[in-house]
From Swiss-Prot:
Residues 427-437, 651-667, 676-710 have a biased composition (Low complexity). Coiled coil: none annotated. This is Mating-type protein A-alpha Y1. Keywords: DNA-binding, Homeobox, Nucleus, Transcription, Transcription regulation. Residues 146-205 bind DNA. It comes from Schizophyllum commune. CDD domains: homeodomain (cd00086). Transmembrane segments: none annotated.
Length: 891
């Protein structure tokens, strides 16, 4: 309190000195501001009669009219009262010369808001009228069923149904819904069509499983063939081929028929015989025929009557002349169309004129198909969907006008009850997306829908067929569902503002150093933040120039794995500085934690099976050699050996082999035995090799029939392999003994008491081997570390156990005074506070890390503003064994 009083006195003295300086320079004091209340002209009331008359013209019900006018009048009254109160208070601090401006602003604000509300009230009539029309249409559609039109069957999509029927005669419900949507018909119509088609079909009907898919290539090939067959029927009239007797084309006159037929030659008419229809000599030059159509029918009848075994099928088409270099010319005479029959005044050309032979050059096919026939084929192959089909070409867009400003939307709520609800956008389809069949996904390439040509997706033979693109709707509004309301609040915090507030807070805390007395004491969390800032080595002048990042992570140069949890709110980046200040103390517990070997059972089993396999192989070789010796003795005529003499060496050799197998792993083999090792010794040496985790060879794993354990997960501990399980590679197999271990890894004082199975460190644990980070709860419970252990490689965070305790291992802060004068400047503040101690178990060794704590056990630790940063040009973690790489650290 005394500090604040002194500060206030200093501020008062500074203000008085400034006033005296201003008066000395000739500054004039301003006139006193009047305190008398200011009265403004009353605001006009809204014109309710005009609004009532306009609402009555549109025949708004009296109840709705009264409710709208009452809400409008009450809103205007509340607005007048709010303006009077606020402007009366503002007028007390405004100069009398500017009161007219304040009055003008008050009147303008009132009139603008009242006019906006009047427009909203007049819109109630239009919304009510639209709602009434919608209800009338719904009532008429639901009650009057006699006038309801019968759904039309779109026969132009029958080929689609027939093509689907060829693949599957029993469509599922989802398939029927999709077919109905594509054809623009009802699902009931599709169901009835398939029922009738199955009843009329003969033979076995195809039936696919619900999860099967239609073969796309075959489906596209059949569709294209079907489209080509239907091409003449689907073409427009001006593109159809000209055929005589077509009912859709006008009858040809005599002059038009003469122009349509090729010119005839003036030669003698040939004699009509039975051979005329079969063969005509090359020298025959027929003249224009004068036979009428009935005589031609008689000739054709005589020619056909001679064939008793076959009946020729006649088709209505023009005469065709077959040309071949090795065979004589033949003329096929077909029956003329019915349109020509009975016309005797038309000259009929039996043989076309002889045209000199020319070597025609085949036109090159161009890749761009811009002809009308190709365009017609494209339109026939991919017809546009029916106008009755629900085709989603784009997302539905509502035509409702957007609000001009957010203030208008917020003012609508002041109108009270009676305002109409916001109309929901009309649904363009009722088929949910999850009901679409997986089988018809193969039919999604454009079958009955227009699509742009894409050579990669739809490789067809035309390029300018369609101009629109079909897309399946995936949003909820397209299927009639209301959009999900987002409950997430917008983030309105500003990074610049947060950084500014944080900088001023640090400046305020650091200014405590300059104060003479430190009473009253700071709260626990502010005290901890001040200690952290002092540890960082900042001063009040450096705080404003340093940029802070509250959400920074740990030093990425030294961290091998960051657990995927909530972002760490604080970091410790400058580990050497923290070590010099004795905030981190690496300590080894007297009782070293030794974890069991998880691979020992598998290694033992592999060794046993390898020895068993070696014994069987040796026995088989001995039996084979015995049979060979017996055969040689029999061939040489030597007497047979006694059974006792045969079995004794076998037993002794088997026993010796067992002894040798047991002793092979514990003794040194010579160079000669290394060049020619036995199978048992090879298996045992391979099984006991130090290649973790695959501690057995491929042959041992295959023979054992079991797999080795996988790499431990995040919740498991790293298996520590005993020292006796390691085999050093070299020219000889070396067994691990105490002398060799002491020579390689150094002597251990507790080796006699603990044993050789404990993990050994070749050198003392140094501070540059570990980096840690703190978590949000204040204790170092979730940490990341990088341990640089020799001969063991990199260790992951998944292989370590971390425990933390707050205030349990408080140490005497007097031991921390060796940090120098810089550290002793603030150690007296943190004398009575407990410490935060974290224990880290790394490869069997336990280390404790201490960081400043709090004098209140219940107060949570706040590390949100604690950041330790490295200098821009320095790299304090260059000696770390980093698997991620990189040297930059974001601060």
């Amino acid at each position: 309190m005394t500090d604040r009083l002194a500060s206030l006195r200093a501020i008062s003295a500074s203000a008085k000195s400034m006033m005296s300086i201003a008066a000395a320079r000739g500054a004039q004091p301003t006139a006193p501001i009047q305190t008398a209340p200011v009265h403004f002209d009353p605001l006009p009331t809204p014109y309710l009669d005009g609004i009532r008359a306009r609402l009555t013209e549109v025949k708004l019900p009296p109840k709705a009219l009264k409710s709208a006018l009452n809400s409008y009048d009450q809103a205007c009254a509340r607005w007048r009262y709010s303006l009077d109160e606020s402007f009366s208070q503002a007028a007390r601090s405004v100069s009398p010369h500017n009161l007219h401006l304040l009055s003008t602003l008050r009147f303008r604000l009132y009139t603008e808001q009242v006019e906006r509300w009047a427009v909203q009230v007049l819109q109630v009539a239009e919304q009510w009228r639209a709602e009434m029309e919608k209800q009338r249409a719904h009532i008429a559609a639901s009650t009057d069923k006699s006038k309801k039109p019968r759904p039309k069957f779109h026969s132009e999509y029958t080929p689609l149904l027939e093509l689907y029927f060829r693949f599957n005669a029993y469509p599922t419900y989802a398939d029927r819904r999709v077919l109905a949507e594509k054809t623009g018909m009802l699902t009931r119509q599709i169901t009835v069509w398939f029922q009738n088609h199955r009843r009329r079909a003969k033979g076995p009907l195809p039936r696919m499983t619900p999860t099967a898919k239609i073969p796309l290539e075959e489906f596209e090939r059949e569709r294209e063939n079907l489209a080509r067959k239907l091409l003449p029927m689907l073409l427009p009239p001006h593109l159809r081929p000209i055929t005589l007797g077509n009912n859709k084309t006008p009858d040809l006159t005599t002059s038009s028929r003469a122009r349509a037929l090729p010119p005839a030659k003036e030669d003698k008419p040939p004699q009509v015989t039975r051979k005329t229809s079969k063969k005509v000599p090359k020298t025959a030059h027929p003249a224009p025929s004068t036979l009428v159509a009935p005589s031609q029918d008689t000739v054709m009848a005589d020619a056909i009557s001679t064939k008793k075994t076959k009946k020729a099928k006649s088709k209505q088409c023009a005469d065709i002349e077959m040309k071949d270099s090795s065979k004589p010319k033949r003329r096929k005479m077909k029956k003329l169309p019915k349109g020509v029959v009975g016309t005797a005044d038309v000259a009929m050309c039996i043989d076309p004129p002889q045209v000199p032979k020319k070597n025609k050059v085949k036109p090159k096919k161009s890749m761009a198909f811009d002809s009308q026939a190709e365009l017609a084929f494209a339109q026939a192959a991919y017809p546009s969907p029916s106008k009755y089909a629900w085709v989603h070409t784009r997302k539905p867009q509502t035509d409702a006008p957007k609000a001009k400003a957010s203030s208008v939307t917020s003012d609508v709520a002041r109108l009270g009850k009676g305002r109409p609800g916001k109309p929901s956008p009309p649904a363009s389809s009722t088929v949910p997306s999850r009901r679409v069949s997986t089988r018809l996904n193969a039919m999604r390439p454009p079958y009955a829908f227009p699509a742009r040509y894409d050579s990669a997706a739809v490789p067809m033979t035309f390029a300018v067929a369609q101009v629109t693109k079909f897309t399946f709707a995936t949003d909820s509004a397209s299927f009639g569902f209301k959009p999900r309301i987002s409950t997430r609040r917008p983030n309105i915090t500003s990074d610049a503002m947060s950084q500014l507030v944080s900088s001023f807070e640090r400046l305020r805390l650091l200014s405590v150093e300059l104060s003479v007395s430190r009473n009253p004491p700071l709260p626990a969390f502010e005290h901890q933040r001040l200690v952290d800032l002092r540890v960082e080595g900042l001063t009040s002048g450096e705080v404003t120039a340093l940029h802070f990042t509250p959400g920074a992570y740990a030093a990425r140069l030294a961290v091998t794995y960051i657990p995927p949890r909530a972002p760490l709110p604080s970091t410790v980046l400058d580990l050497p500085r923290a070590l010099r200040a004795r905030l981190v103390h690496p300590m080894v517990l007297p009782e070293t934690v030794t974890q069991p070997d998880a691979f020992a059972p598998f290694i033992a089993l592999a060794e046993r099976r390898a020895r068993r396999k070696a014994r069987k192989e040796k026995k088989r070789q001995e039996e084979k050699q015995a049979k060979k010796d017996k055969k040689e003795r029999k061939k040489a005529g030597l007497p047979h050996r006694a059974p006792s003499t045969v079995d004794a060496p076998d037993v002794s050799s088997r026993a010796s082999s067992l002894d040798s197998d047991v002793s092979t792993s514990a003794r040194k083999s010579s160079k000669k035995s290394k060049r020619q090792p036995s199978s048992s010794s090879r298996a045992s040496s391979v099984a006991s090799s130090g290649r973790t985790p695959s501690l057995s060879s491929t042959s041992s794993r295959r023979s054992s029939g079991m797999s080795m354990p996988s790499t431990p997960g995040p919740e498991q501990s790293l298996p520590i392999v005993a020292a006796s399980d390691f085999a050093l590679g070299g020219e000889e197999d070396v067994s691990m003994d105490a002398d060799l271990m002491a020579q390689l890894f150094g002597s251990d004082e507790n080796a006699d008491a603990v044993g050789y199975d404990l993990p050994m460190h070749p050198e003392p644990f140094t501070a540059d081997m570990i980096t840690f980070t703190s978590c949000a709860d204040g204790a170092l419970g979730d940490m990341t570390a990088d341990v640089n252990m020799p001969n063991l490689g990199q260790s992951s965070i998944d292989d370590m156990n971390w425990t933390a305790s707050v205030g349990s291992n408080a140490q005497d802060p007097a031991s921390q005074e060796s940090g120098g004068d810089e550290a002793s400047h603030w150690l007296d503040i943190s004398f009575d506070r407990p410490t935060t101690t974290s224990q880290i178990n790394v490869l069997g060794g336990t280390y404790s890390c201490e960081l400043g704590g709090s004098d209140n056990m219940n107060a949570p630790l706040d590390f949100s503003d604690l950041t330790f940063g490295l200098d821009t040009g320095a790299d304090y973690f260059s000696g770390f064994n980093n698997t991620i790489g990189g040297t930059t650290i974001m601060v």
